[in-house]
From Swiss-Prot:
Keywords, sorted A to Z: Lipid transport, Secreted, Signal, Transport
Gene Ontology cellular component list: high-density lipoprotein particle; very-low-density lipoprotein particle
Principal localisation: secreted
Cellular compartments annotated: Secreted
Keyword flag Signal: yes
UniProt record similarity statement: Belongs to the apolipoprotein C4 family.
Keyword Secreted: yes
One GO process term, biological-process aspect: positive regulation of triglyceride storage
Domain of life: Eukaryota
Recorded name of the encoding gene: APOC4
Secretion signal, residue range per the UniProt entry: 1-27
Protein known as: Apolipoprotein C-IV
Described purpose of this protein according to its UniProt entry: May participate in lipoprotein metabolism.
Record organism: Tursiops truncatus
């Protein structure tokens, strides 16, 4: 559920979650000896070679990207990123959430008061 007026915060939180998920997947895929692609099997037609070539191309792309971003996967750099992200985007979320809860409570009470007949709901009850 998105809080009114906090869509940019929700989007930044979603991007952060996707980034963390990508980090976890990349760390899990990395084995102790690195990734090695199996040797391609002989194929009967040239079209059957396409999936193998695509897989080989993607594995090399992922490996090169992982190697060039190795500094980012380290715990020190990632911890610094998380701390900066929290300070920039999530640090004052508690005060925003409290303000939203108070405004929602007031709005809900006003709607309930409007629906309540005058004979059942006296002014002294709501004060």
């Amino acid at each position: 559920m998105l809080f009114p007026g906090c869509r940019s915060r929700a989007l930044s939180s979603l991007c952060f979650c996707v980034l963390v998920l990508a980090c976890v997947v990349a760390c899990q895929q990395e084995g102790p000896g690195g990734t090695s692609s199996p040797s391609p099997e002989p194929a009967s037609s040239s079209w059957s070679l396409v999936p193998g070539k695509m897989k080989e191309w993607m594995e090399s792309l992922v490996t090169r990207t992982r190697e060039s971003w190795q500094w980012f996967w380290g715990p020190r750099a990632f911890q610094g990123f998380v701390q900066t992200f929290y300070d920039d985007h999530l640090g004052d979320l508690g005060s925003h959430t409290q303000a939203w809860l108070h405004s929602s409570k007031d709005s809900l009470l006003n709607k309930a008061y409007d629906l309540c007949p005058q004979l059942l709901c006296r002014d002294s009850y709501w004060d």
